[in-house]
């Protein structure tokens, strides 16, 4: 009976991946337009901008009834608008993400760091439920990091998930074959067993991306030595208190504390707290957008996990994926 269930599961996966590949996305409503400024609280001439970064880090577009730009495009749009606003004196980036793809994580880090250098204003990272792996990578572009007491962070490292479905497919009489120009062309295929030589090649790529992660942490946490960072960067997660004790973050604090720190670093006695949103989004306080957009692991449903079993490109991830 157990073997029958396994076969049925394989057939379901194959069917679903086929359906997904042939799906057509139909957008019934018009795009929601450019981001607009929304004032949340405070008074004064200067502004502290609150930016939200929630969910899986990916360059995939957000399809649905209301099409949205991917998170890289949205983040760039927000930073571009802020760079042109002389009244924006500080930025708080609220992070709630388990990470995502290596390249998308690095692009976000690069864009935020370039913005900070050119704008010459303080940037504070405020970590929510999860700011792990790629989420922590992004925080390295900030001037200070505050975490909630219940935040989970860390997971410094790289992962590439592959699936070997050869044995299961053999049980249902399915055989996959690839015609290639060279022996390594189908490395990582889920339809055959990976050779030791191929595993070593993948490991070399992962090691390279891991060294990149370490160098970014070194630049963002100059208080830590290279030896300390290497010891902390074994992939484990940390609570907010543990991360502070290890020197991975600066302090324990809530979003209000991050906003106050931003005002202090910008030399503002008072300031307007503003954020950006699109048409149709209701935001009346500093927590509105966080729970309206879908965050953390809830957003993992939007990630194309099926690509890992349908022969898609293996994903190199800065991702906490227990």
Identify the role of each PLM range.
Residues 132-133, 152-156:
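Short gly/pro/ser/thr-enriched loop/turn and capping motifs at secondary-structure boundaries
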Residues 2-125, 130-131, 140-148, 159-322:
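N-terminal organellar transit peptides
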